[in-house]
Amino acid sequence: MLPSCYANGSMLPDNEELVNSMLANPDYLRTQVSPNPLAPSAVGGAGMEGLMCGSFSPAFYYQGIDSFLALHNNIWGLPISFLHNSHRPEKPPFSYIALIAMAISSAPNQRLTLSGIYKFIMDKFPYYRENKQGWQNSIRHNLSLNDCFVKIPRDKNTIEDNDSAGKGSYWMLDSSASDMFEQGNYRRRRTRRQRHCGHPNRYERESGKDSNDGNSSAAEIRSPSEPLSDFDIFCNERPNYSDRITDLHRQYLSVSLGFNSLFNNEARGLRPLPEIRECPDDVDASSSSSKAMQSSMELHEELHSPSAFTPPLNRRETSSSGAPVLAEAFNGIKDVVDAPGSSPVASSNRSKTTLFTIDNIIGKP
């Protein structure tokens, strides 16, 4: 059976009033705590009546928690976030691209190293002074993946202001992306643009020499007396990746054109067949059929010869001469036929005995 104090709640004061009274005077809990009534010295001569709840001090039930309750008068009404660090600065409402652009624009020479960008962000925005590894990785990714930022090689022998050592490279804003952020509003970002250098690259300059439009290409080239900026020097030394791929594709097409012409019907129709000498009147009809078979096999050997797959050095020479370069493969056959001292009959007999024809297979005389 429970003690009477648990059955009748009127004997104890209200819990809320008790907590408020203890918070108002925290020393009350320490001074009013009585010894444990359940100790042997306390219950030695007392009966069950001495163990009634009414004989305990109210502070007995709350001892040990006064230091926690004394933190705040309304601690139980505070949110859970109060237990965390509530003094961390708020995250700035700017993207990483905007932070990088702000850092580079604030530099005197409009260029900064990677460590300089880190320093600017941490000095201006205290939020980024913690968890440096996470946001610094994001800064590096945005520098390498966006065309609005240009990496400029740095001279290791020169040390500028605010630079501890000549290491790393400079980062600059692309001149073609100057209008990406409108009126200093770094929250907006336009569609990603592809960077184009102001000067023609090496491949365009070589092609411009062969073309007849020399005046137009010369107008685009800046005069030698005008100084070049770091960005222009960087573009001249390193052409765009897309331009290099385009030039490689152009070279591949020029080489593969020789292979495609072998299977073109129009080019095949223009290819002359090797000369076949007229046989004497005493040769029968079977020899004429063997000659036709011989010419077809020679054409097959022409298409499958290694020289047929050699691309022509110049297409103009091939088209102007009228005879393709593949006709050189028959020079050996023509030399045998046109050799001095050989008669037409001897050449026809040699072709009958050496060629792999249907007549030789069936053994027809």
UniProtKB/Swiss-Prot annotation:
Keywords: Developmental protein, DNA-binding, Nucleus, Transcription, Transcription regulation. PROSITE patterns: FORK_HEAD_1, FORK_HEAD_2, FORK_HEAD_3. InterPro entries: Fork_head_dom (IPR001766), FOX_domain-containing (IPR050211), TF_fork_head_CS_1 (IPR018122), TF_fork_head_CS_2 (IPR030456), WH-like_DNA-bd_sf (IPR036388), WH_DNA-bd_sf (IPR036390). The keyword Nuclease does not apply. It is found in: Nucleus. Residues 285-295 have a biased composition (Low complexity). GO terms for cellular component: nucleus. Residues 183-224, 276-295, 305-324 are annotated as: Disordered. Residues 90-181 bind DNA. Residues 186-199 have a biased composition (Basic residues). One of its GO terms (molecular function) is RNA polymerase II cis-regulatory region sequence-specific DNA binding. One of its GO terms (biological process) is positive regulation of gene expression. Its main location: nucleus. During embryogenesis, detected in several mesodermal tissues including the hindgut mesoderm, the ventral intersegmental 5 (VIS5) muscle in thoracic segments T2 and T3, muscles homologous to VIS5 in the abdominal segments, and a small subset of visceral mesoderm cells found near to where the gastric caeca form (at protein level). Expressed in embryonic posterior mesoderm. Residues 201-212 have a biased composition (Basic and acidic residues). PANTHER family: FORK HEAD DOMAIN-CONTAINING PROTEIN L1-RELATED (PTHR11829:SF388), FORKHEAD BOX PROTEIN (PTHR11829). Transcription factor. Coordinates the placement and migration of various organs during embryogenesis, including the salivary glands, hemocytes, germ cells and Malpighian tubules. Likely acts non-cell-autonomously to provide signaling cues from the mesoderm/musculature to nearby tissues. Mediates salivary gland positioning, at least in part, through activation of the secreted signal Sema2a. This is Fork head domain-containing protein L1. The gene is FoxL1.
